[in-house]
């Protein structure tokens, strides 16, 4: 059974929708890029689950970024992805982190920045303070600010798995909250191990066995890095030829490592010369 799936569901007897996401292989692939401390592994797992839920909730075609910034020992944690739930992530930290460190302890004072870049149309950015204590509470506040929709979020992670649930009033029914309040109480009984070990149908049956739940086709979630040799070459072109030749003289080659995965791209003197030869040809073509 695949462990990297997002399920969407509706209640036929209530104006409420839900989502359930379970991550394993994609989460492990993301963690493999760096030797993250345990607390940071958990944070990235919650953030990956949160980004999956957010992406599936907002109807758009394009890219999404959910970024945590703070003045604590963790200065940055970010998940980037697209509407096809192809995600990647990275974090930066300094010093030792307690295994059970909370969000405020890890990031201090800071913000969650959610950026949507649609294939067509204008870019949108929402900012929420991290003062709400947990990542789930911050995401609930985001929906409260941007959509004005009652929303409940549950996020769980270990160093091996991540999972999450979202419960939300349908956009056209936000004034009717009785059903949502009832279902919220039921959803709050979910246990992390149930989300880690059980399939979606069994989880939903345990939570809502007296409700009429309609489960839709699952959506695959995957780890996918967008790095490439061409992108690395583009980054090198932002430096001058003199700077690059200085590095080559000292190192013999230039290695470009990706923060998001374990890929590395190596450039020698011939490669660098070819890059700037291409620039020269392009420049000449434009001036002719």
UniProtKB/Swiss-Prot annotation:
GO terms for biological process: protein refolding. One of its GO terms (cellular component) is cytoplasm. Disulfide bonds join 225-227, 258-261. Keywords: Chaperone, Cytoplasm, Disulfide bond, Redox-active center, Zinc. GO terms for molecular function: protein folding chaperone; unfolded protein binding. InterPro entries: Heat_shock_Hsp33 (IPR000397), Heat_shock_Hsp33_C (IPR016154), Heat_shock_Hsp33_N (IPR016153), Hsp33_helix_hairpin_bin_dom_sf (IPR023212). Gene3D superfamilies: helix hairpin bin, Hsp33 domain, HSP33 redox switch-like. Under oxidizing conditions two disulfide bonds are formed involving the reactive cysteines. Under reducing conditions zinc is bound to the reactive cysteines and the protein is inactive. PANTHER family: 33 KDA CHAPERONIN. Redox regulated molecular chaperone. Protects both thermally unfolding and oxidatively damaged proteins from irreversible aggregation. Plays an important role in the bacterial defense system toward oxidative stress. This is 33 kDa chaperonin. It comes from Shewanella denitrificans (strain OS217 / ATCC BAA-1090 / DSM 15013). The lineage of its organism: Bacteria, Pseudomonadati, Pseudomonadota, Gammaproteobacteria, Alteromonadales. The gene is hslO.
């Amino acid at each position: 059974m695949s462990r990297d799936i997002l399920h969407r569901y509706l209640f036929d007897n209530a104006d409420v929708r839900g989502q359930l996401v379970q991550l394993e292989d994609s989460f492990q692939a993301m963690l493999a890029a760096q030797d993250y401390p345990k607390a940071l592994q958990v944070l990235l797992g919650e953030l990956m689950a949160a980004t999956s839920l957010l992406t599936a909730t907002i109807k758009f075609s394009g890219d999404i970024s959910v970024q945590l910034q703070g003045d604590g020992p963790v200065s940055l944690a970010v998940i980037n992805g697209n509407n096809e739930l192809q995600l990647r992530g990275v974090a930066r930290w300094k010093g030792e982190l307690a295994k059970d460190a909370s969000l405020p302890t890890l990031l201090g004072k800071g913000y969650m920045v959610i950026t949507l870049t649609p294939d067509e149309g204008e870019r949108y950015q929402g900012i929420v303070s991290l003062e709400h204590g947990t990542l789930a509470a911050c995401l609930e506040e985001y929906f409260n600010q941007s959509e004005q929709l009652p929303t409940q979020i549950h996020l769980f992670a270990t160093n091996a798995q991540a999972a999450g649930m979202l419960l939300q009033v349908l956009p056209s029914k936000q004034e009717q909250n009785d059903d949502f309040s009832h279902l919220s109480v039921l959803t709050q009984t979910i246990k992390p191990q149930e989300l880690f070990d059980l399939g979606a149908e069994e989880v939903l049956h345990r939570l809502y066995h007296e409700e009429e739940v309609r489960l839709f086709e699952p959506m695959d979630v995957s780890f996918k890095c967008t790095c490439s040799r061409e992108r690395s070459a583009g980054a090198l072109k932002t430096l001058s030829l003199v700077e690059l030749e200085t590095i080559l003289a000292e190192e013999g080659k230039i290695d470009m490592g990706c923060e998001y995965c374990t890929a590395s791209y190596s450039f020698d003197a011939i490669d660098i010369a070819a890059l700037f030869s291409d620039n020269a040809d392009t420049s000449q073509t434009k001036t002719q």
